[in-house]
Structure formats: C-alpha cells, structure tokens
Amino acid sequence: MDKNLLKYIYTVPVISTLWLLLTAGILIEINRFYPDALFYAF
C-alpha cells in the first residue's frame, strides 16, 4: 500500500470525528442561547 494512502485512511476518521463534534457543539450552544431559532423560517 502507498504510504500516503495509509496516512489518509488513518487521519480521515479522526478529522471527521472532530469536525462532527465541533458542529454539534456549535449547534448545541446556539440552541441553548436561542432555543426557538430552529423553528423560525429565516
């Protein structure tokens, strides 16, 4: 296997997990300060 491919396979799950945690945290904080914002039509 190519060394770059192995590095890609091992780093993508870590980066995607961190990205999902960051996105969820941002949504949770927005929902905490503006609880009705998810129901308004922007």
Swiss-Prot record:
Principal cellular location given in the protein's record: plastid
> What highest taxon heads this organism's lineage?
Eukaryota
Q: Identify its protein family.
A: Belongs to the PsaJ family.
- State the name under which the record lists this protein: Photosystem I reaction center subunit IX
Q: Extract the Pfam families matched here.
A: PSI_PsaJ
Q: Where are the transmembrane segments?
A: 8-28
Gene3D superfamilies per UniProt? Single helix bin
Gene Ontology CC terms: chloroplast thylakoid membrane; photosystem I
Organism the protein comes from: Cyanidium caldarium
Question: Single Gene Ontology BP term?
Answer: photosynthesis
Name the job this protein performs: May help in the organization of the PsaE and PsaF subunits.
**This protein's UniProt keywords:** Chloroplast, Membrane, Photosynthesis, Photosystem I, Plastid, Thylakoid, Transmembrane, Transmembrane helix
